[in-house]
Amino acid sequence: MNFYVEVLGCPKNEADCALLKSHLRKMGNNIVDNLSDADAVIIDTCGFILDAKKESIEEILSYVEYKKGKNLKVFVTGCLVQRFGKELKKEIPEVDGWFGVLPPKEIATHIGKRNVIPEVPEPVYNFEGRVDNGQYAYVKISDGCDRACSFCTIPLFKGSFKSRKIDDILKEIEFLIERKIKEIILVAQDTTGYGIDIYRKQMLPELLKRINDLSGDFWVRVMYMHPDHITDDIIEAFSYDKVLKYFDIPVQNGSDKILKLMNRSRKTRQLYSLFEKIRNFYSDAILRTSIIVGFPGETRKDFDETLKFIKEVKFDRLGAFIYSDEEEASSFSLSGKVPREIAEERLEELMDIQSQISFEKNEKLVGKKLKVLFDEEEDGVLIGRSYMDAPEIDANVFVRGEFKKGFFDVKITSADIYDLEGEIVEE
């Protein structure tokens, strides 16, 4: 059977589907890049917030419409199914199979035979091969979450925090290096908590050391670091040659009152100290964060505190989102809901400030050299990234030329608000 795989949602889904494709191939199937060549479609969904749910449902419905009059099967898997499986099966009976949060091998084994939506999510797995395109790959080191952020529903459909064994992760990374993958991106709900459940201590520093010891020309990026777990040992582990000094630390807000309502344990003064410590360790550290605006109870004063926080820290990269009022989240019962139009205005105001910070930082890069990895070519322009940018969520470096694999030194010739332009420095 020819399978076309559509991946929605976060990079953890990308990692899961890379393994799913490998298991499907081992069972005698083919993975196709064109929908017109497919006998079956697998849609891996996201069920985190309202916008993600809408996108997933719209995609499912579009494939259901597409398959009319065709000999095409549509299968749906992932977080949306784990969270709303019963309702989905009732509302969209045209789907040929539903699978919740399961190891990819389980999905490949049961697809076309029966639905599998486990009572207890099973988000981690053992490595047995994967299929990737491009020069970067996401590697899931753990999944699930034991925290209780009031706005978050992830523990409901991903379950408790579970780490993979370190040797299994290294086996997967060695597999990727052998296949010339140049950027290994470690993902989890909280990468800094890696190992606490199975080794009874934080193992991210040890994991980074052992990855760094592997031979090959590649670099390592760490995503989703919860500020509560960031120790000096973790910060020091970013000194390894192959580990990028890129710190993705979602703080969610800059008001102590709102942080308390979010059930986040760190106060802003502690967050300031953390970011100051990282920059004292590494003058070239890139700080990335995420901010939620419009949280219940957020007043103009609270929002101004967040703006002050952003202006003072001057994050290199920042993503901001409007609060999504999820019925199963404890924040759903909070009073003081912020009207959508006010939240949208605050989001725009915040991003205006961040764009100024970003442009000022980018201007300072003009004339300097950056090591760049190219992801694709479009109309004679190479689209790449330096150590400062993760795929899809951050900025790009644009260079005229034909696609090249590997790392290249690029001299920056001009700067935009977020993106850079440059030219390859010939040796």
Swiss-Prot record:
Coiled-coil residues: none
Binding site for [4Fe-4S] cluster 2: C145, C149, C152
Organism, scientific name: Thermosipho melanesiensis (strain DSM 12029 / CIP 104789 / BI429)
Ranges of residues in domain Radical SAM core: 131-360
Top EC class of this enzyme: transferase
Job of this protein: Catalyzes the methylthiolation of an aspartic acid residue of ribosomal protein uS12.
Stored Pfam families: Radical_SAM, TRAM_2, UPF0004
Protein name per its UniProtKB record: Ribosomal protein uS12 methylthiotransferase RimO
Main localization category: cytoplasm
